[in-house]
Amino acid sequence: QVIKILVVGCGNMGASHAQAYHELPDFEIVGLVSRGDSKRELNVRLNASYPLYEDYAEALADSKPDAVCIATYPDTHETYAVMAFDSGAHVFIEKPLADTVTGAERVIAAAERSGKKLVVGYILRHHPSWIKFIETGRQMGYPLVMRMNLNQQSQGYMWDVHRNLMKSLSPIVDCGVHYIDVMCQFTDARPVQVSAIGARLTNDIPEDNYNYGQLQIRFDDGSVGWYEAGWGPMMSETAFFVKDVIGPLGCVSIVANEASASGHSD
């Protein structure tokens, strides 16, 4: 059965998903939704003529999708996901599920109420390098020390993207959901303590947000981990890409020889 899918958000991730749906025979794109010109540019890139929508509610009602791919800014995730479930569609949504814990709980409740699938884009769970990294790290004994970061010296277009993201959330929330999920896969123990620090290094973001942060997490088997993320042209490129796990029996790391602090190296 071909799945009719509505793609909401036509930026980096939305365009990537649309490219896949365009090429996979099991999917039929029934619409592209965005607030700007990105949907038209995506149609050109795909050499397609998919229906284009400015308004998400109109797109849902008109296209009647089997599933919705939500790749918009995080402050819309909760509302868009609940609307999709209320329309009877399955949902694939980019991380984070919502920009608050209570928002995420409301999305989950809507999924359960509708009986439809809710899938969050935890890409690292399917990445061969990360699968091997976790498999090897679990052989290092316990407790583990898990050190991870991704600092991005973003400029120009990417700094615009990051500033827009920081209107609703911080770097450690946007990216950290990946790495806390990874830490939970390294150890089957229960997280028991979380703390964090942060700093606002620019006036270009809301006063109540920060563009540099580090969180620390402790598990009940004695394992500990930290994750650090910073965005902006002021960020240092020294030790900006750390993916490292240490246990009683040794250590394992991901070394990105060609990673760029201003690129997309998750």
For each feature predicted by the language model, list its residue ranges.
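N-terminal Rossmann-like dinucleotide-binding module
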Residues: 1-47
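Hydrophobic residues in well-ordered beta-strands that form the structural core
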Residues: 54, 93, 118-120, 227, ...
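Rossmann-fold dehydrogenase core element
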Residues: 106-123, 141-148
